[in-house]
């Protein structure tokens, strides 16, 4: 019987999820056995708190975590029926966070509304391997600003290679006036592969994959992952405050 495991990881510590000696999957194989499937093949630099892997072995999360390196945790498990495909999820929820340089919020929201729905997203995909359909459905894209940051939430059934990072770039570009509504409509109606750059990977995190499956949470493992990300956040916030103070000190010389 196959088993699903929810995993959280700091993507800045690994060279992607799979396909490289320094990727995450070799570590997961040592801890959980052969990986039969995965929820998302995240790029180098992309983090996750709700990615999923499937194996044939039943392993307690604490036992798996004892074999995993710093920055990755198994924190929940579920038994699933034979033939279960972790690529076929009800929905996937990603968050992209970017610095706010004064991008117009209304323009970004208009772009997000255009990009949501069912479309051919070939302009927003970087192909790898064999050709696959670039038609998919995005249920919602929400845009909000908080202080110096822009938060972009993407919820959809499935996303292709680099797709969210390219969509994020386009939405931010709309906020800067670089892309107009008709430019975005044109990219959807007349696909131009390679026309849209990718936003930096470090701004992206996979928050959840919904299968309608009830997972058993290992709370000690969950808390360890939480404490790690909180620790990373506080140190990053302190470093950001140093740079802000330095900039303000230099700006004062112009007064």
From Swiss-Prot:
EC class of the enzyme, as a word: isomerase
Domain of life: Archaea
SUPFAM superfamilies named in the record: Pseudouridine synthase
Record bears the keyword Endoplasmic reticulum: no
InterPro entries for this protein: PsdUridine_synth_cat_dom_sf (IPR020103), PsdUridine_synth_TruA (IPR001406), PsdUridine_synth_TruA_a/b_dom (IPR020097), PsdUridine_synth_TruA_C (IPR020095), TruA/RsuA/RluB/E/F_N (IPR020094)
Residues holding substrate: 94
The keyword Ligase appears for this protein: no
EC number(s) from the headed UniProt entry: 5.4.99.12
GO molecular function, one term: RNA binding
Residue positions of the active site: 43
UniProt-listed GO biological process terms: tRNA pseudouridine synthesis
Alphabetic keyword roster: Isomerase, tRNA processing
Recorded catalytic activity of this chain's protein: uridine(38/39/40) in tRNA = pseudouridine(38/39/40) in tRNA
Family designation: Belongs to the tRNA pseudouridine synthase TruA family.
Protein purpose: Formation of pseudouridine at positions 38, 39 and 40 in the anticodon stem and loop of transfer RNAs.
Name used for this protein in its record: tRNA pseudouridine synthase A
